[in-house]
């Protein structure tokens, strides 16, 4: 028993050392005020959505993009219907998206789908008209000023930006509530203080932007792990790119609510 207690004590100390700095983060927003934005310039954005059998929700996301306060002529929505067996592609087209369909059971995952979609965009638009790309999951819904707010932070000079990931099903059960609280903590108590301190933030799954310049420097979208968001974050930090955070750009995500889905 003494050995087990000692192991538990050592683990507790290690976790305390690793996470103690986050207690300081709680104070940062009250001590350091956000820097004023630079004058915003208009940029052209491509929205990337990877969807597999998302016919029930894909239309809601595209509609929320079409309702943005940002000029619609500067936003093009692309959907890759990835190994779909339902009407995802048809519904996305009906709501105004440019849709490509992908069928590949050997290379499975969001990273492969995004890589496929970006290659198709290059073929369709060889002149490369887009300044930056935004990535969303098919079950997201955006606040009406989401793109406008992201554009303001992009105009500040950030080449990679993450946003505030909120929940649209917080009250379903304890699992969805737990995920919602985790992502609230990640946005408000990790990325926000890091942004105030001038350090790099972290991309988390959905609701992020990267510039054409970053895509070129990465040699395309070559992030294929199950946690491709973490892989992308680490690649940017290792290569000296600072990831920004836009607290005013809010999206609502349908979070997992069963242990089987996890």
PLM segments and residue spans:
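Cell-envelope/extracellular polymer assembly enzymes that use nucleotide-activated donors
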Residues: 44-46, 76, 231
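Long helical/loop segments within the catalytic core of UDP-sugar-dependent glycosyltransferases
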Residues: 103-126, 130, 144-226
